[in-house]
Amino acid sequence: MKVIEPSSNPTKGITEKIDFGAMFPLQLDNSLTDLDKIKTLIVGGGQVNPKLVEKLQNVSTQVYETYGMTETLTHVAIKPLNGPSKSDVFRALDDIHFELDARECLVIHATALNPEPIVTNDLVDLIDENSFRWLGRYDNVINSGGIKIIPEVVEAKLSSIVPNRRFFIAGKSDKSLGEKVVLVVEGKSMDIS
């Protein structure tokens, strides 16, 4: 076992091969040039953005995004981000299963971790009781003229159109729609083609 001081680039200075590691998305992004030092890596603590997933397609390290929260004490599902098993679907770990509540938010059943079902605010496309596709947060939904828009879904689709800029989708009050969708892009000017 190798313990490393907390850093935004945990692979810096590592010379030996590591069988298994864990990072946050920021650490992963900063470690891409040395990632081949790690055989298998889990990434958690935040969503891995699509541009970073693209960068992972040519690395030898098998990288998995984890899904979990404080209430589960650990991750409860994983999805492969690269390699032949790459997927956009999270799969439950052993002895864990899922369902939806009335809001279409994920409910986690992990009795070894918590005897009560854990109700989340995560909107998901539930594929079956063991797998789901994460869509976004219930708290972020924009209701525009009665249509519920999940900002995270729109942002994922725009990520290839808005290159090299940080951006987000937000709701803004509108007299006729209730809320309208607004794209906020960092920077002074932009050319979208």
What is each of the regions a protein language model found here?
Residues 1-30:
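AMP-binding/adenylate-forming
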Residues 20-22, 42, 184:
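Structural motif
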Residues 24, 68-72, 120, 144:
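Ser/Thr-glycine-rich phosphate-binding loops at phosphate-binding pockets of nucleotides
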Residues 35-85:
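Gly/Ser/Thr-rich phosphate-binding loop
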Residues 64-71, 90-91, 170-173:
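Beta-strand->loop->alpha-helix junctions that form or flank phosphate-binding loops
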Residues 77-81, 101, 186:
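Short beta-strand-to-turn element immediately C-terminal to the catalytic PLP-Schiff-base lysine
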Residues 97-125, 182:
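AMP-binding/adenylate-forming core of the ANL superfamily
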Residues 121-193:
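AMP-binding/adenylate-forming catalytic core of the ANL superfamily
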